[in-house]
Amino acid sequence: MRIILITGISGSGKSVALNALEDAGYYCVDNLPPRFLPQLASYLAEDGQDRLAVAIDARSSASLDEMPAMIRDLSRAHDVRVLFLNASTQSLIQRFSETRRRHPLSGSTSHDADVGLLTSLAEAIERERELVAGLAEFGHQIDTSNLRANVLRAWVKRFIEQKDSGLVLMFESFGFKRGVPLDADFVFDVRTLPNPYYDHELRPLTGLDKPVIDFLDALPVVHEMIHDIEKFLVKWLPHFRDDNRSYLTVAIGCTGGQHRSVFIAETLAARLASSANVIVRHRDAPVEAGESSKLVA
């Protein structure tokens, strides 16, 4: 059975990810107390289910301490993958304010004595970060601070389409003006390259459009940058694989995350597709009008 565990910070998009998995045919359970996970997996396997997705939050903090060992045990019999969703505190506060939902640890005394009384939203968020921090190392971390809900759904779809084993390598384009992604393992700054933004015909386009591709592809300095990044990754990917790393996020940043970083992320992904399970995400590139720009808890 393939088991996908969705955890992380409340408000970072766990419900969006779980809904995407349900649409993909997974048996989904939200807010399952972690101690019941092995029994649920066994029951569903006996019942013929082959795909399970479970969202876990910090309300059962005592059980969270048991999760690392539980994940290792489950991995012996099942294909277990962990998605750890994160976001900046500022983004989370804004989302809870917009949706008028209460944080699970905010405003009341938890049944867990370790949590106690948390009166402010910011305090609850920081406490939750402490409670779930130990799970981050088991899965792929994704920063949803500037991520639209439709983009997260598409990313989850690509994630579950990856092969059962091997290193998952994600290339993430972004704009420095909106901050560096929290989930990045490596960050490459390509702002020194010529910027298509200053060509008025190219300005409204992205690095996925042929005119921008042709513009950047004609510049030797762009190919030098791509070659150097590729050479670095080709050298070090085997070491990460030998270290049992399952996920590696390579962030490519330009000023706005629209032209140069998008083109280079796509090019690197194509070149390294045979070396790892590759996923591409464009955090800040414009999307079609009308798509949702909000995530829910």
UniProtKB/Swiss-Prot annotation:
PANTHER family: RNASE ADAPTER PROTEIN RAPZ
Binding site for GTP: D57, A58, R59, S60
HAMAP family, alphabetized: RapZ_like
Protein known as: Nucleotide-binding protein Bphyt_0592
SUPFAM superfamilies: P-loop containing nucleoside triphosphate hydrolases
Lineage of origin: Bacteria, Pseudomonadati, Pseudomonadota, Betaproteobacteria, Burkholderiales
Family: Belongs to the RapZ-like family.
Gene3D superfamilies: P-loop containing nucleotide triphosphate hydrolases
